[in-house]
Amino acid sequence: MKMTVDFEECLKDSPRFRAALEEVEGDVAELELKLDKLVKLCIAMIDTGKAFCLANKQFMNGIRDLAQYSSNDAVVETSLTKFSDSLQEMINFHTILFDQTQRSIKAQLQNFVKEDLRKFKDAKKQFEKVSEEKENALAKNAQVQRNKQHEVEEATNILTATRKCFRHIALDYVLQINVLQSKRRSEILKSMLSFMYAHLAFFHQGYDLFSELGPYMKDLGAQLDRLVVDAAKEKREMEQKHSTIQQKDFSSDDSKLEYNVDAANGIVMEGYLFKRASNAFKTWNRRWFSIQNNQLVYQKKFKDNPTVVVEDLRLCTVKHCEDIERRFCFEVVSPTKSCMLQADSEKLRQAWIKAVQTSIATAYREKGDESEKLDKKSSPSTGSLDSGNESKEKLLKGESALQRVQCVPGNASCCDCGLADPRWASINLGITLCIECSGIHRSLGVHFSKVRSLTLDTWEPELLKLMCELGNDVINRVYEANVEKMGIKKPQPGQRQEKEAYIKAKYVERKFVDKYSVSSSPPEQEKKVVSKDSEEKRLSIPKLGPGDQVRTSIQSSVKSNDSGIQQSSDDGRESLPSTVSANSLYEPEGERQDSSVFLDSKHLNPGLQLYRASYEKNLPKMAEALAHGADVNWANSEENKATPLIQAVLGGSLVTCEFLLQNGANVNQRDVQGRGPLHHATVLGHTGQVCLFLKRGANQHATDEEGKDPLSIAVEAANADIVTLLRLARMNEEMRESEGLYGQPGDETYQDIFRDFSQMASNNPEKLNRFQQDSQKF
């Protein structure tokens, strides 16, 4: 290492040493200025580079937008996408380069300035301080008089100590100078070398990237050459066609008079006609008319849905109109209305009249052929009739979820667009959907619509019955109540954007629901409706006592209650085959009166409407309440804070419970007595509901205010089926906990038993009547 300042000169503290120090200190000060400037320039370069990358990213987004716009042109879309991806890689390479620049230049040089140059400055301060002390000691020693021995001795000692300290610090200072002079070379070169390697990597990555892209660019260049040639050829052809058409326009108008009854697209004739409006001013508007599918329709813009003037051409006639002032008019007359039209010329008028007359004749001929075929099909032989009955019987026996659900009124077509044969369903709404509408429903989120396939998914019996209870007609009466009044047209199949807007407005914004004012009824009336039942309940609800008291209470109520679900003979809904209200456990028979006579459901708030409809097993009213914003977990403070789900349990309907659970009901929400839906279902002996709640994650360890959980209640009531279900669920829960995080979702035996109970509760509820039959023996 070459020394900048000599150690020997340092010990002498000669003028040469002082001059060398002064030169070094000036050099270090200038070095610090240069390094600070370089670091600032590096920071500015990095910031500018980041701004460049940001602008480049925005430019890439513009290229991607252009690629999406060119989705119909595969060559342009593919090329732009590929180029934007490659340029995005270059942006990433730039980002890496700027990061490496920050580490190599900014970080390293800043560290050198802050660490090494700071040590040099600290050493300089110490050296200057000890130099001053040495000068003072020399001056003091020179001033001491010879006859003052004590002072001479003291000054000599101070001078000796100061000189020793000066030499030590001066040597350290010189060492720091020499080390700094040597280190600055390595630090500067190391940072610049790292910076250059970063550039090397950047350009190497760019070279590799464009080497891969090169063949594609060459192919694209060849395609572009062909495109230029093809464009020139097409231009010549179009110029020739333009010249030919121009000559035809001047020579004849016959091309506009053609019509074709057997056209492949079904359009017999089309063109512009003036139509007289039916308003008081009788204004004439020019519209694009066409004869297609035995109908006369018109539209103003291509995107507009055609307006049907005549639905069935067989029912109309066409005639000339010479009694009005305007020329070239003719009238299409149907049994309900007439439409006055005007052509641009007499030839066009004759062509339109002939086209309408020919279409009428064709419609009669086609309809006649169809009727003949239907007559042949509707009169089979006796043998074929029998075989038809047999096949129908087989079909009913092997009935699939799709067939059962599509038999519900309105379910044979999509609920939102009307497309036939829908294969998907929204299970919380109870409607059928086509595949395109189902995709839109999925995008809404499961809190609005839960989509399931009617052909690919497994359907639980209670869910299948729920779908059969509702249906498109029921739901559309709620969610499309004001569609006609608002003049809204349902989207047609294939109109994706229109469908999305319509479905969002229908189910998310609920724009078409018939809004009714909750505040239209005085609060006193609403309170009266609720408080009558609640007052009777407060006077009659017994506490669940131990032992026989519980058994006697339950047995007296269950004599008229089924533990499963079966079809009611009068309205077809699912209900318990009981002769008294399911609330008979809590009220003496005959005390309860139906409070629904006091106020129509439209005058209740949505939460109360849902609450009452849940007990009454009225699914359409429940759907209506939810559409009006009812909270599915609304608690009735007048009736022990019972929820709609608890009311559904008391009402004895498995399907009602399933509907509430599908719409987000909390299976563990409890009333003021600490009883949740599982408690109430256990008390009432509703085995099907207990099975349903356990499958939905009900907490069977929860205790009521008397400290009883559902299992203890079932044991005291000696309900073997419910005890079996609760113990099996508890055992399965313990098995899953012991197996840890990656354990199986459930034991096969457990799943099979619960599946059997679900099937019995929905399809054969009489098999779950054992508890009722046994209780009658006591």
Curated annotation (Swiss-Prot):
Residues 524-539 have a biased composition (Basic and acidic residues). The keyword Coiled coil applies. The modification Phosphotyrosine is found at Y742. One of its GO terms (molecular function) is GTPase activator activity. Pfam families: Ank_2, ArfGap, BAR_3, PH. Residues 266-361 form the PH domain. It is found in: Endosome membrane; Cell membrane. A zinc finger (C4-type) spans 414-437. Its main location: membrane. This is Arf-GAP with coiled-coil, ANK repeat and PH domain-containing protein 2. It comes from Oryctolagus cuniculus (Rabbit). The gene is ACAP2.
